[in-house]
Amino acid sequence: MASLTNGFKYDVFLSFKAEDTASDFAGNLYNALKDRGIRTFMDDNKKRENGEKLFKTIEESKTAIIVLSKSYASSLFCLEQLASILDCMKGKRKLVWPVFYNMDPSNVRSKTRTGKLMGVHKAWFNHYKNSLKKTKKALHQVADLSGFHLNNGYYAVFYLLFCVYM
């Protein structure tokens, strides 16, 4: 078991859509953080940690980085994770850092675009209306947070700046 520093098991909880970013941006960010001794939790979306265990891991993390990619909102798993992060971080003075990866933050804010991305879930999970409302609200909340808009290939600069900040 990892040692606790300042009451946290992890310095960073990394949330992302594996198919979009795991092999490049998220993987490189994870390695850059780890190489600098920053304790980072990375769930590659393949393990699909159960909800309780994942929520506990979020609670045990000081900071969350949410890598919002073009298909992040098409994953119900990612949206539920996002809602859990925002619920857990609310009122606990924990940082949430959204990273808009190869997409414009206004696309996340846009009800039309968000509606299109979440349309798949509305059709499949019509009986989970409360869950969908919660995840849609979380998506709008994260879009309003200050974060990083990366779509110009300067990812190494982001890794360095974030690691220096941590």
Language model segments and positions:
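Conserved N-terminal substructure of TIR/SEFIR domains
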Residues: 1-63, 94
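C-terminal interaction surface of TIR/SEFIR-family domains
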Residues: 1-12, 20-24, 103-166
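Disulfide-bonded cysteines in secreted/extracellular proteins and peptides
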Residues: 13-15, 78, 88, 124
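Structured beta-strand/turn binding interfaces of compact recognition modules in eukaryotic regulators
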Residues: 15-19, 36, 43-45, 67-70, ...
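A general alpha-helical scaffold signature found inside nucleotide-binding enzyme cores
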Residues: 28, 80-83, 130, 134
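Alpha-helix boundary recognition
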Residues: 34, 59, 86, 140-143
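Short, flexible/disordered secondary-structure transition segments
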Residues: 40, 75, 96, 149-150
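Amphipathic helical hotspot of TIR/SEFIR-family domains
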Residues: 56, 60, 67-109, 117-118
